[in-house]
């Protein structure tokens, strides 16, 4: 009898059959850029299912067992039909999505995927220079971005159509090796301006140059011989042809 062993005792015949056995393996894979955001679980649990019903207790996968496990000595068939084995991860890992690939014959792989969190750094540029009174303001400036003290990017910034100076560094990693990255910005030196950085906003200040204008009243009248000299006169200062301030009095 195929697949059976036969033992004859006198006139009695005994046929024996050993049900087939199988094994099922599972491996845990992490797709998270080497745990960049530090969210990876230290351990997960996996449940084996036989024809949709839980088989045994969940098993733990972790670094100690290389995130892999094999169920051995499993029955191949039940009620004359081949058993379909599947696996599922117990619960969820916060911040991850889970996919299961493979089969009982080749082994299952449970992949947890996390896309590292991204951020943008935005800032504004303001000028404190009396509306560029002295014509010193440049047409463009350079802003440099640093990640934990190391330069990561730079950007040339100009005024937009409304005259506003803004910049943005996008698609930046929020974490590195599980620790939040500290981003800072600097500005290349702007001649004659001082720079103050507040967070990601940059303010450049320039003190317009100052000058002075003097006037002296002289009398050419032979020392007021005829007594016509005025006791006081007034003088008006002009800037580019327009009166500047009030007239001032000159007298003895």
Positions of the model-derived regions?
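Solvent-exposed loop/turn and edge beta-strand elements of beta-rich ligand-binding domains
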Residues: 1-252
């Amino acid at each position: 009898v195929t697949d059976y062993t036969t033992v004859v005792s006198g006139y009695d015949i005994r046929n024996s059959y050993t049900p087939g056995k199988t094994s099922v393996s599972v491996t845990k894979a992490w797709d998270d850029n080497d745990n960049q955001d530090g969210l990876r679980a230290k351990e997960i649990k996996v449940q084996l299912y036989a024809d949709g019903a839980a088989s045994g207790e969940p098993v733990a996968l972790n670094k100690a067992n290389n995130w892999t496990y094999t169920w051995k000595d499993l029955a191949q068939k039940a009620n004359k039909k081949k058993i379909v084995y599947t696996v599922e991860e117990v619960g969820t890992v916060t911040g991850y999505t889970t996919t299961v690939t493979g089969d009982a014959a080749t082994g299952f792989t449970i992949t947890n995927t996390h896309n590292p969190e991204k951020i943008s750094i935005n800032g504004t540029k303001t000028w404190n220079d009396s509306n560029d009174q002295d014509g010193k303001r440049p047409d463009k400036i350079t802003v440099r971005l640093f990640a934990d003290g190391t330069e990561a990017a730079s950007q040339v910034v100009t005024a937009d159509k409304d005259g506003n100076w803004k910049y943005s560094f996008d698609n930046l990693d929020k974490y590195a090796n599980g620790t939040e990255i500290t981003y800072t910005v600097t500005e290349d030196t702007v001649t004659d301006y001082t720079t103050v950085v507040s967070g990601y906003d940059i303010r450049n200040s320039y003190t317009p140059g100052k000058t002075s204008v003097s006037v002296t009243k002289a009398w050419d009248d032979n020392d007021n011989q005829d007594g016509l000299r005025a006791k006081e006169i007034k003088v008006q200062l002009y800037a580019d042809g327009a009166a500047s301030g009030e007239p001032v009095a000159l007298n003895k």
